[in-house]
A protein has these predicted regions:
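Regulatory cytosolic signal-relay segments
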Residues: 1-6, 10-11, 26-30, 51, ...
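A generic short-segment signal for beta-strand/edge and adjacent turn/coil regions
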Residues: 89, 97-106, 152-157, 195-202, ...
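Generic detector of bulky aromatic hydrophobic side chains
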Residues: 95, 120, 125, 174, ...
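Catalytic NTP-binding/metal-coordinating core of nucleotidyl cyclase/transferase enzymes
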Residues: 120-203
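Alpha-helical context
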Residues: 109-124, 132, 136, 161, ...
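Short charge-dense sequence patches
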Residues: 101-118, 148-164, 208-216
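A broad, low-specificity signal for short, low-complexity segments enriched in glycine/proline
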Residues: 90-98, 145-150, 189-191, 233
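Catalytic beta-strand-to-alpha-helix segment of the class III nucleotidyl cyclase homology domain
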Residues: 3-73, 192-280
Length: 280
């Protein structure tokens, strides 16, 4: 077979596999979304089986009330080994659900565990024992007009985006997540670990430098004056899905957000306060 035809065949096979992957993940999302039931049900864990996956879904409130009974209910990856999966199913008295890939027996699955996790995590609740988070708060936010408030939030978001891009240009791993507080943002690195925490601090420093430069160029009331607090601690994570789609926002709540919310009251405009950074 000519090399050109071989290349064309490989491209077609690759496109077909990509289409199969997207269709399968869309079906999985649809099933987990139906289980989710507007947020009353949380997906807890899954494990691979020959023709698909087994997974657990229980009332979200049960996840919180049972979190101390087995660490893997909220800690670690949602893909579980057979023994752990069985133990948690028995502990939560959960029915084991089955999702079939609906593929011929000789056809390998076009999805990876990471693909499945990317969908599964939209409907899961997890806890992180220690992660760096910073809180950007716009000083005197309530004193500005709605137009000025919108401009300031937009400028703050722009600085965070620029900072993340600049840090990434140096080959540093940063996947910045944020959730709004109304007059600012909590921000953290989705990547976990001490290096990731250092990287998110670097993002913060670049963002603050960018904001300082903006103050020299743009009308004062359009550029926010920032109070910032930074620290490390534990938190729960969840994804807030929209009613009609899986699009939504990441949220964190727990020890670290409570501590930062208290600490911000002591921060002055243009000041950074740093909470305890000890590793627990």
């Amino acid at each position: 077979m000519p090399a050109e035809n071989t290349d064309d065949s490989a491209i077609l096979d690759s496109l077909e596999n990509l289409a199969d992957r997207n269709r399968l993940l869309e079906r999985l999302n649809g099933e987990l979304r139906a289980q989710w039931n507007f947020g009353s049900i949380a997906s807890v864990g899954w494990r691979p089986v020959d023709d698909g996956i087994h997974y657990l879904a229980v009332p979200a409130l049960m996840v919180f009330s049972s979190a101390q009974k087995h660490r893997r209910i909220v800690h670690g990856e949602r893909m579980m080994g057979e023994r752990t999966f069985k133990d948690i199913a028995e502990l939560l008295e959960a029915k084991i659900e089955h999702f079939s890939f609906d593929l011929p027996e000789d056809r390998p699955a076009p999805v990876s565990p990471a693909d499945i996790n990317s969908v599964f995590n939209r409907y899961a609740i997890t806890q992180t024992r220690n992660r760096a988070v910073f809180l950007h708060d716009i000083a005197g936010f309530s004193l500005f007009s709605p137009e000025e408030q919108a401009a300031q939030l937009s400028t703050l978001e722009y600085s965070l985006n620029i900072a993340e891009e600049k840090i990434a240009d140096f080959g540093t791993e940063v996947d910045l997540a944020r959730s709004t507080t109304g007059d600012g943002y909590y921000a953290w690195n989705r990547i976990k670990g001490e290096d990731a925490d250092v990287n998110v601090f670097c993002v913060l420093m670049v963002a603050l430098a960018h904001q300082a430069l903006q103050h020299r160029k743009i009308t004062q009331r359009q550029i926010p004056t920032i109070r910032t607090v930074f620290g490390r601690g534990s938190h729960y994570s969840y994804h807030q899905n929209n009613r009609v789609s899986a699009d939504g926002s990441d949220y964190i709540v727990g020890e670290i957000t409570i501590n930062l919310a208290r600490l911000i009251d002591f921060a002055k405009p243009n000041q950074i306060l740093i909470s305890s950074l000890s590793q627990k």
